[in-house]
């Protein structure tokens, strides 16, 4: 593992974060690696990390990680959620989902396990098997440690689980520190109230104890843990809207302001931060949400779940949300959290993971093209040339999901001879417009004719 050599000299230091080194003017091996992957200058990567506009989630205890970057200067990234639940799934199924997610292009993976076995064993196995950054929501295991009795949780319970995740090699954690007790009454006019699982746990704790959010009051302690291992904050949006009616409301925006304050507090200690966002947002409010986050959070990378642009399509929410995700990415969101067809209905299986990921790779790629990122359209142009030349195998190779493209083609024309045919089953051999090859010689003749007889052509029209 090459990265083992990179991090060996850092272990034991008080602060080993990428931001800490970047602010000292040091371009780490991870920054060089990211620069090569993004086709960007290493100094630009260092500068973006130093100012907090880019993060490289890279726990020093995750040596088999292939470093990647999340930030507006980099390509738009996609996260896939996996995780066992008490009612469904197990370790082997989750490892299979991890492999599938990586195969279909997940840039990071979050383990959201809430049951289904030994959570520490599941998490450790996922980290050891993963070349991509792993994120977690430690509040889930904190609740499991007290057998679901929210009121029994103490601040030390939260901190213990957070440190354990950091020691195990988790690269970023969702920390719901922006949900303050005074914000809870703001949800009373919502249709769906609080839809964040972590936020719901903390809300119950505050309602029972009538005390401030322990993740907020102990935020400095969490910073100290993150400094030691280079864990990045993914500041959770506990008050994200769970339906269009609740989008961009007072509760959501109040929490966002606090998330901005927490971002800057973490930066004071050179700890990396990204900020999570909605959710369910009408199309005409997506740009406002992205701009507002950049303003409140000093341009820390934005990481959104969707957003879904309509609430009436259960079973198709990978589509309703990919529409919003493409727009959010275009406006400057750095990472998109995928939504599967099972959203709101049940735990996704392997095929759901595949469908959700491909939908989001499409959204992220469309955003990269719209933002004119270097080389973003190269693959599109190459596939278009292959399509025009009826190079079917090359088209399949360049597709986001080569197996699905080949499968659909071969449903009607399975024989190998059709891989060189100048048609597909849509138009057949006589009606395919791409057979109309206008060569350079014919065009040159036409241009001469048009130049000579332009008036005559215009008159006849």
UniProtKB/Swiss-Prot annotation:
Q: What Pfam families would the database entry show?
A: ThiC_Rad_SAM
Which residues take part in binding Zn(2+)?
280, 344
The metabolic or biological pathway listed in the UniProt record of this protein is:
Cofactor biosynthesis; thiamine diphosphate biosynthesis
Biological process (GO) annotations held by this record are: thiamine biosynthetic process; thiamine diphosphate biosynthetic process
Q: Does the keyword Transport apply?
A: no
Q: What do the Gene Ontology cellular component annotations say?
A: cytosol
Question: Which terms in the Gene Ontology molecular function aspect does this entry carry?
Answer: 4 iron, 4 sulfur cluster binding; carbon-carbon lyase activity; zinc ion binding
- Note the superkingdom of the native organism: Bacteria
Co-factor requirement = [4Fe-4S] cluster
Binding residues for [4Fe-4S] cluster, per the UniProt record?
424, 427, 432
Q: How is the cofactor bound?
A: Binds 1 [4Fe-4S] cluster per subunit. The cluster is coordinated with 3 cysteines and an exchangeable S-adenosyl-L-methionine.
Q: What is its EC number?
A: 4.1.99.17
> Binding residues for substrate, per the UniProt record?
81, 110, 140, 176, 196-198, 237-240, 276, 303
Listed A to Z, the keywords are:
4Fe-4S, Iron, Iron-sulfur, Lyase, Metal-binding, S-adenosyl-L-methionine, Thiamine biosynthesis, Zinc
Looking up InterPro entries in the UniProt record yields: ThiC, ThiC/Bza_core_dom, ThiC/BzaA/B
Q: Which reactions is this enzyme annotated as catalysing?
A: 5-amino-1-(5-phospho-beta-D-ribosyl)imidazole + S-adenosyl-L-methionine = 4-amino-2-methyl-5-(phosphooxymethyl)pyrimidine + CO + 5'-deoxyadenosine + formate + L-methionine + 3 H(+)
Q: What is stated as this protein's family in its record?
A: Belongs to the ThiC family.
State its role. Catalyzes the synthesis of the hydroxymethylpyrimidine phosphate (HMP-P) moiety of thiamine from aminoimidazole ribotide (AIR) in a radical S-adenosyl-L-methionine (SAM)-dependent reaction.
Which named protein is this? Phosphomethylpyrimidine synthase
What is the originating organism of this protein? Thermosynechococcus vestitus (strain NIES-2133 / IAM M-273 / BP-1)
